[in-house]
Amino acid sequence: MKVQASVKPRCEYCRVIKRKGVLRVICSRQPKHKQRQG
């Protein structure tokens, strides 16, 4: 999981969601694309 100031979807399978006030990117195709805003 990457922690970044700005999270963006990196492919068509990436979804931006908000959990407990934190923006996250989850990806069903490439788990490598997981990101968290921090």
From Swiss-Prot:
Pfam families: Ribosomal_L36 (PF00444). One of its GO terms (molecular function) is structural constituent of ribosome. GO terms for biological process: translation. Keywords: Ribonucleoprotein, Ribosomal protein. InterPro entries: Ribosomal_bL36 (IPR000473), Ribosomal_bL36_sp (IPR035977). One of its GO terms (cellular component) is ribosome. Belongs to the bacterial ribosomal protein bL36 family. This is Large ribosomal subunit protein bL36. It comes from Roseiflexus castenholzii (strain DSM 13941 / HLO8).
